[in-house]
Amino acid sequence: MNMGRVWEYIYWRLPVGKRQFIDRANQMLEKVDGLKQTLELGIKNSYNHRNQLYEQMSRKIDGLSREVRKLHEENTRLERIVTHYHKQDMQMFWEEYRKEGETTIDAQKRFFLSLPKAQGINRNLQLLEKDLLRAFSEICEENQMEYWLYAGTLLGTVRHKGFIPWDDDIDTCMAREDIDRLKEILKNNEEYCLTVKYDAWGYCKQIRFGYKNSELPVFIDVFPFDWACLASRESWEANHRVKMELKAELSNEENALIREFRAAGCVDVDSVIGKQVAVIFDKYYNKLREDHVLCDKEEAEGFLFSFDSWNPCDDSNINAVSQFFPLQKLEFEGLTCNVPNQYMYILHELYGEDFYTFPCGEPHFIHADWKKNKKLLAEEVKKRVK
């Protein structure tokens, strides 16, 4: 049907004359054209307005980016100045503090050993953690499982013979297979437990030794490590790649299990979700074994902090076996505890050459707020600490 016949069809059904019909049709066409022009103009104006807004936003973002860069550069400059003067102040301080005939390092050791212990809430927390470390160490020794003190706890052991006064946690390390053994050994223990949880947002396992029946979440951290075929950069890179692959898979919320896991945040390894998540973690561990990155203790030349550990997977996390084993013994708060064989080398690697100095800036990361549990914390100390 052509348009002429359409108009003819409409014309014979309208109660108006031909002239009136044509006039009315022309009026309608003019209105349609007007609406079309108005619509096109509106679209054009909207498009132009959007472009103007985009340009304005781009200019503002560029300006803010420049400001951020300037602030970052200024902050870096100020940090260098503060660090410079901090070092100068420290040099002057140690020069004044040093006794006649005493070396600077001996003066530093004397100073840090003379610092008073923590007080109040922080000290009560430290005392409970010390009690846990005592039990942890005894259980490991009785069952021929090797552990050692690490990070801030190792620094405190060497520098303070105990806790750094402003610290509030204990860090230990253990081989993956010994952690599995320890969990089994403690299964029926009435006093202590080893909790192992998958952390959806840390992309790792949280492993903690603590009291079985306690109203307070007091614990010591246990970081796993794996035996490596080689103490090489290539081993670290393979471990790091797997860590990144695990992180990517645990971020994929198109997967229903991952959505459920991330909604829960943290799940016990023995829970329904935990057992499903374990399949993902085990897949990456088996990959490292199959690729001959990881091996058994007897074949290892090095070890890696595990890809599923909370520890950051940086390039200091590959070590030769000889740097850590055989373990040595040092005093920590009156306890005799394991430390790495070359513990001074490890501390220099972690904290730089001069760890016998005051921290520049904020010295302490607060791991938990215990003020609301102050009374309960004191009661737990009386009950448990001998």
Q: How does the language model describe each region?
A:
Residues 1-103:
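Boundary detector for helix-to-coil junctions that initiate low-complexity/charged tails
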Residues 75-149:
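Helical scaffold of the NTase/Pol beta-like nucleotidyltransferase catalytic core
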Residues 118-141, 186-240, 244, 252-351, ...:
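Conserved catalytic core of two-metal-ion nucleotidyltransferases
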Residues 137-170:
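Active-site nucleotide-donor binding segment shared across nucleotidyl transfer reactions
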Residues 146-147, 171, 329, 336:
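Beta-sheet entry/capping signal
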Residues 155, 180, 228-230:
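Surface-exposed, flexible loop/turn segments at secondary-structure boundaries
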Residues 160-182, 334:
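Catalytic metal-binding acidic patch
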